[in-house]
Amino acid sequence: PASSSIGPTYQRYAPMPIQPDIYTYNNSDDTSSEPAAGIAQSGAAAELAAGLLDDKAHVSPKYLYDTLGSKLFEALCLLPEYYPTRTEDAIVAANMASITQAMGPDATLIDLGAGNCAKAARLFPMLQPRQYVPIDISRDFLEQAAAQLQPRYPHMRITPLGLDFSHKLDLPASIPAERRVFFYPGSSIGNFSPDQASAFLRRLRNACGTDGAIVLGVDLIKDAAVLQAAYDDAVGLTSAFNLNLLRNVNR
């Protein structure tokens, strides 16, 4: 969930617990000359064509997230205007005890759209999952983040998966079927149409089983000026992030 107000006073911080060097864009580790590795290339052209030829032309937000797009979004979340990240962090921190009590230790934490893994990592000290499964469409970026995270939690199994979970969720047999907790923060559910969101939540419900749980972040109604500032920032990061979608799909 996210508060209906802008939230706590913004303070610049280094997202934890990833090493700071992951936040510096470096051409030497950018694999974005290729489309996001988690996208099935065989179906991408047909999906893009169908969206662009629709009565309301659209492109799925998943195409925002190649390596460069993931780094741009990471930087965007630190902007003063971008309230969702810090507000949601504050809500989770304020309710951590009740979240932990409801879930209990030793669950398998499955982080959908994990990015740099920083949001889920804040849950580790209290939730103490036995396994962490970050999932993201930008495989190279995700694997770099997971590799930096593993030494900090040597007793926890970290299994990064680069895949597109927007239409189906096929988890490998190495992911225990019991005590699955799906974590989907950031109000990303808003990227789906109502019908798509319903189908997506049903898939999560089926995947988490009878002893699992879903932690879902959803933004509330905001003043137009707040949204305008958050999604059309003064330094142009959101613009660069969105334009990178064209760069990605044109490859």
Map each language-model feature to its residues.
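N-terminal auxiliary segments of SAM/dcSAM-dependent transferases
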Residues: 17-63, 70
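Class I SAM-dependent methyltransferase Rossmann-like catalytic core
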Residues: 57-66, 71-103
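Conserved class I S-adenosyl-L-methionine
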Residues: 106-115
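Conserved SAM-binding loop of SAM-dependent methyltransferases across substrates and taxa
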Residues: 116-128
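Class I SAM-dependent methyltransferase SAM/SAH-binding core
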Residues: 129-167
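A short SAM/SAH-binding and catalytic strip from SAM-dependent methyltransferases
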Residues: 179-198
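A short glycine-rich, Lys/Arg-flanked "PGG" loop and its adjoining helix->strand segment in the class I
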Residues: 198-210
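Conserved beta-strand signature within the Rossmann-like core of class I S-adenosyl-L-methionine
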Residues: 207-220
